[in-house]
C-alpha cells in the first residue's frame, strides 16, 4: 500500500502543517477541514500545497520527521516553490 507525505497551509493562521497518510488525500484533507480536535481543528481553510508519494507509511513518516526537524518556514516554502502541488487538491 502506498502512502503520502503532505504539507497543508492555512491562510487564516498563516501556518503550515505537515503530515502523512495512507488514505486518499482528498478524504484526508476533508477530515482536516472538518470540525475536530487537534492543531488543524483551529480552522477549516487548509489547502494542500505540497505532496510526495512513498511506497510505505514508514517512508512517508520518515520524510515528515525530516521536514519537521528543519524547523524552518523558509526551507518549507522553498520546497513548496520548487515542487508545486498536483492539480485538483
Where do the protein language model's features map onto the residues?
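GIY-YIG nuclease catalytic motif and its immediate N-terminal context
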Residues: 1-37, 41-51, 58-68, 72, ...
Amino acid at each position: 500500500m502506498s502512502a503520502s507525505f503532505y504539507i497543508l497551509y492555512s491562510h487564516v493562521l498563516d501556518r503550515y502543517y505537515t503530515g502523512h497518510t495512507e488514505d486518499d488525500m482528498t478524504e484526508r484533507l476533508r477530515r482536516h477541514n472538518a470540525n475536530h480536535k487537534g492543531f488543524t481543528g483551529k480552522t477549516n481553510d487548509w489547502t494542500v500545497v505540497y505532496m510526495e508519494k512513498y511506497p510505505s507509511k514508514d517512508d512517508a513518516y520518515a520524510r515528515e520527521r525530516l521536514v519537521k526537524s528543519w524547523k524552518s518556514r523558509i526551507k518549507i516554502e522553498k520546497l513548496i516553490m520548487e515542487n508545486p502541488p498536483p492539480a485538483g487538491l
